[in-house]
Amino acid sequence: MSEKLIVKCPTCRTEVIWDESSPYRPFCCKRCQLIDLGEWAAEEKRIPSQSESNDSDEWSEMPEQDPKPFN
């Protein structure tokens, strides 16, 4: 039998066995999973990019030049 892979929960650092017995892996529990999700949703975490600009800087709300009525 092979050795079981053990990882640390990204939220609380508790050791977690990486197999079917740990349904929230890599998290130790649903609570830690939701804490992490909340941090991503609040934009406390992000994936680093090479560019420093924010994607929203490139977005603009431009009104239509020639709106056409619906007929």
Swiss-Prot record:
Q: Where is the composition biased (Acidic residues)?
A: 54-64
UniProt feature coiled coil, ranges: none
Q: Which cofactor does it need?
A: Zn(2+)
Sites where the protein binds Zn(2+): C9, C12, C28, C32
Q: Which GO terms describe its molecular function?
A: DNA topoisomerase type II (double strand cut, ATP-hydrolyzing) inhibitor activity; zinc ion binding
What does the annotation say about its assembly with partners? Answer: Interacts with GyrB.
Quote the NCBIfam families the UniProt record gives.
Answer: PRK00418.1
Its function, per the record, reads:
Inhibits all the catalytic activities of DNA gyrase by preventing its interaction with DNA. Acts by binding directly to the C-terminal domain of GyrB, which probably disrupts DNA binding by the gyrase.
Query: What's the protein called, per UniProt?
Result: DNA gyrase inhibitor YacG
Q: Which gene encodes it?
A: yacG
